[in-house]
UniProtKB/Swiss-Prot annotation:
Signal peptide region: 1-17
Domain of life, per lineage: Eukaryota
Protein name from the UniProt record: Neuferricin
GO biological process, one term: nervous system development
General function of this protein: Heme-binding protein which promotes neuronal but not astrocyte differentiation.
Stretches assigned to the Cytochrome b5 heme-binding domain: 53-150
Domain remark text: The cytochrome b5 heme-binding domain was proven to bind heme, although it lacks the conserved iron-binding His residues at position 90 and 114.
InterPro entries reported in the protein's UniProt record: Cyt_B5-like_heme/steroid-bd, Cyt_B5-like_heme/steroid_sf, MAPR/NEUFC/NENF-like
Family according to the record: Belongs to the cytochrome b5 family. MAPR subfamily.
Organism the protein comes from: Danio rerio
PANTHER family per record: MEMBRANE-ASSOCIATED PROGESTERONE RECEPTOR COMPONENT-RELATED, NEUFERRICIN
Keyword entries, A-Z: Neurogenesis, Secreted, Signal
Any single Gene Ontology cellular-component annotation: membrane
Chief localization: secreted
C-alpha cells in the first residue's frame, strides 16, 4: 500500500512540474484522463472492498454466450459490466472479442487475433499507455465497474501489483510529456501550408492555423527540435518576448521578418 501511495504522489508531482515557460491552458483529453485516473486511484485506496475479485476462468463465463453469467470485460485489470452495450459487445457485435477477458493490448494495437487479445502491455511506450488510459476513462464514465481481475494487475486481495505500478509510472511520464506538447502547441501553433509542382511550397499564419483559435495571426518561423536537425513551421507572436530567448527558432530564407506568409523554393 505504501508503494501505491508513493506512486500516486509521484504522479501528481510529475504533472505539476511542467516548466514555467509552458504554463498554458491544457486542452483535449489529458486533463479529463488525469482527473478520472486520480479519482479512481483515491477511491481504490480508501475503499474497504474492491468489489468482485474474478479469476481469468471466472471472467470467461461472462462473455454473453449461451449459459453466460452476464457480459463483462476487463481493461488494465478493472472489470466492467457492458450489458447495456450488448448490441456492440454481445455475440455478433463488433466488439464481442473484448468480452470475458482482459484484452488491454488490443485496444491500442488493433490486433484482434487470439494472440493479440492479451493484457500484456509491458512493452508499450508512454504515449500508448496514455492512450490506453483514455479507454479506461471511457469505461469508467460509461459503464458500471464490478470488480478486479486477479492476475497481472491485481492480487488475490485486490491490491495493485508491481506490474500495474509500472504501468502507472509510465502514465505519469506520458501525461507530463503530453501536457508539455499540448502547451507548446498553444505557444507555437503550426502554420498552414500548401505545395504545388509549379511554384513549390508556401507556409502562412492565420487566427486558426494549427487548429489553435486565437486573436492574433503571427508570422512563420522554423522551430527546430534540439539535436535532431528537424523542424516544423510555427506561428509566433512578435510582441511576445519569450520568442527572442528561443534559439531553436529561425526565419525563413528570403522571407521578410514580419510577413504572414513565406514562399518556400523548390529543392
Amino acid at each position: 500500500m505504501l508503494k501505491y501511495l508513493v506512486a500516486l504522489i509521484s504522479m501528481v508531482l510529475a504533472v505539476w512540474t511542467v516548466p514555467e515557460w509552458l504554463t498554458f491552458p491544457i486542452y483535449g483529453n489529458v486533463v479529463t484522463v488525469l482527473e478520472s485516473w486520480l479519482r479512481q486511484r483515491v477511491s481504490e485506496v480508501s475503499a474497504s472492498s474492491p468489489g468482485l475479485l474474478l479469476t481469468k476462468e471466472q471472467l470467461s463465463l461472462y462473455n454473453g454466450g449461451k449459459n453466460s453469467k452476464g457480459l463483462y470485460l476487463a481493461i488494465l485489470g478493472q472489470v466492467f459490466d457492458v450489458e447495456k452495450g450488448r448490441k456492440h459487445y454481445g455475440p455478433g457485435g463488433g466488439y464481442h472479442f473484448f468480452t470475458g477477458k482482459d484484452a488491454s493490448r488490443a485496444f491500442i494495437t488493433g490486433d484482434f487475433t487470439e494472440a493479440g487479445l492479451s493484457n500484456d502491455v509491458s512493452d508499450f511506450s508512454e504515449s500508448q499507455i496514455v492512450a490506453l488510459y483514455d479507454w479506461l476513462s471511457f469505461y469508467q464514465r460509461d459503464y458500471t465497474p464490478v470488480g478486479k481481475l486477479i492476475g497481472r494487475f491485481y492480487t488475490e486481495t485486490g491490491q495493485p501489483t508491481d506490474a500495474l505500478l509500472h504501468v502507472e509510472a509510465f502514465l505519469s511520464d506520458g501525461l507530463k510529456k503530453k501536457a508539455q506538447a499540448q502547451s507548446e502547441m498553444q505557444l507555437y501553433p503550426s502554420c498552414n501550408s500548401e505545395w504545388s509542382e509549379a511554384s513549390g511550397g508556401r507556409v502562412w499564419c492565420s487566427t486558426m492555423s494549427g487548429g489553435i483559435h486565437r486573436d492574433w495571426v503571427g508570422v512563420p518561423r522554423m522551430l527546430f527540435t534540439p539535436g535532431s536537425g528537424h523542424s516544423r513551421c510555427v506561428c509566433i507572436r512578435l510582441s511576445d518576448p519569450v520568442h527572442s530567448e528561443n534559439r531553436n527558432l529561425r526565419e525563413y530564407t528570403d522571407c521578410p521578418p514580419r510577413a504572414e506568409s513565406c514562399q518556400i523554393a523548390k529543392d
